[in-house]
Amino acid sequence: MSFSVDVLANIAIELQRGIGHQDRFQRLITTLRQVLECDASALLRYDSRQFIPLAIDGLAKDVLGRRFALEGHPRLEAIARAGDVVRFPADSELPDPYDGLIPGQESLKVHACVGLPLFAGQNLIGALTLDGMQPDQFDVFSDEELRLIAALAAGALSNALLIEQLESQNMLPGDAAPFEAVKQTQMIGLSPGMTQLKKEIEIVAASDLNVLISGETGTGKELVAKAIHEASPRAVNPLVYLNCAALPESVAESELFGHVKGAFTGAISNRSGKFEMADNGTLFLDEIGELSLALQAKLLRVLQYGDIQRVGDDRSLRVDVRVLAATNRDLREEVLAGRFRADLFHRLSVFPLSVPPLRERGDDVILLAGYFCEQCRLRLGLSRVVLSARARNLLQHYNFPGNVRELEHAIHRAVVLARATRSGDEVILEAQHFAFPEVTLPPPEAAAVPIVKQNLREATEAFQRETIRQALAQNHHNWAASARMLETDVANLHRLAKRLGLKD
């Protein structure tokens, strides 16, 4: 069998029809699977010694979220090292990265595999992989025919990456430097909300504006901050992180602005604060809403005038710092309640970003699950970690109040449980490996604790226990926010919860 001119023309036409790179890539992969009559095909991008799926056909959806590190996938490493078509024999001892990931064929091993490395000049930029269940599935195609396919795919991928590079550098084609893959933090997700967020990150990254990142606990606000920094002109300088919720009031000012020797008991030497460390770079202030009003005033001055004073020093230091702030609270409500300065809010929220909760991201949950499965596979030295159809269905229908962080922990826990129930280095995650609660907390009246046959102390503790549970649920298990809601000190709340058996 050989390719006709019509077949090649059809592939080229499909590459031009798509609206946007993602659509073009998907059309290419779907067309290739039809033309080559294979069971699965994938277009992968090469970045930092790993292959990142861009488009798939015939494979489980979670493959799009996986990141295939070369050291963990010898077949993909062989493709990356090759300069030409790679055909793996049916009896190859090298494990196939897609074993168990072809829907309906989970228990079978892939038999035929062809890899086509894709180049832009001398640079490896990606690969095409073709898989089939029959050992001789690709024998009818010559290497020359497969090279033509690779050339078309390489051209499409190279153009897409070059456009991405030009857009990130805000350059015109005539000013382009030699092709170089753009390395940025991977934001996994193809849902409309995540697509819009990625566009907004691209827009604001090129500027020097302060950014306020809002979103529920566990949605990935720190990852957004990293993506902004890495795509900004400040990327060559440090990104400094500070969790404002973990700052004791007594040392908060020193952490932010530094101190001089002798400024207070224990200040045995001069020390730079986070603003100095982030000079010419970016400072990420996580949980900005936890700062006291006094510190908010000092932070505002830095944003206004660009100078800081170390604790115990009368001299001012000039700093050039871009501030990215994150919060899981509604700062507008905090301003109205008098807990957050309006002028600081407006300084920080020049360009606000909102990270969508996982329950609003549709199929992104499966992509993220695939990413975490691959992480577990590498960490535990397993040959494969795959999700059963029932497990995928369960993940798609659970609302994840803890968002991406809860999903990550659920996958890691499920892998450990699944591994304990079977021998070997292959793990299949079933629905029973996930211990998701059937229902959320009932309404207060249904959850009221009866006091019949209870003494006063028992009734009081039961009431305290239920009140703390409800406060935590309403504040997404943020202890500091729950303490404010209950009008108590967060340290006292932790101690009370421990005494009541609500935490270890």
Swiss-Prot record:
InterPro entries: AAA+_ATPase, GAF, GAF-like_dom_sf, Homeodomain-like_sf, NorR, P-loop_NTPase, Sigma_54_int, Sigma_54_int_dom_ATP-bd_1. Keywords: ATP-binding, DNA-binding, Nucleotide-binding, Phosphoprotein, Transcription, Transcription regulation. Residues 479-498 bind DNA. Residues 187-416 form the Sigma-54 factor interaction domain. One of its GO terms (biological process) is phosphorelay signal transduction system. The modification 4-aspartylphosphate is found at residue 57. Transmembrane segments: none annotated. Signal peptide: none annotated. SMART domains: AAA, GAF. ATP binds at residues 215-222, 278-287. Pathway: Nitrogen metabolism; nitric oxide reduction. Disulfide bonds: none annotated. PROSITE patterns: SIGMA54_INTERACT_1, SIGMA54_INTERACT_2, SIGMA54_INTERACT_3, SIGMA54_INTERACT_4. Pfam families: GAF, Sigma54_activat. The keyword Cell inner membrane does not apply. GO terms for molecular function: ATP binding; ATP hydrolysis activity; DNA binding; DNA-binding transcription factor activity. CDD domains: AAA. It comes from the Bacteria. Coiled coil: none annotated. The keyword ATP-binding applies. PANTHER family: ANAEROBIC NITRIC OXIDE REDUCTASE TRANSCRIPTION REGULATOR NORR (PTHR32071:SF35), TRANSCRIPTIONAL REGULATORY PROTEIN (PTHR32071). Required for the expression of anaerobic nitric oxide (NO) reductase, acts as a transcriptional activator for at least the norVW operon. Activation also requires sigma-54. This is Anaerobic nitric oxide reductase transcription regulator NorR. It comes from Escherichia coli (strain SMS-3-5 / SECEC). The lineage of its organism: Bacteria, Pseudomonadati, Pseudomonadota, Gammaproteobacteria, Enterobacterales. The gene is norR.
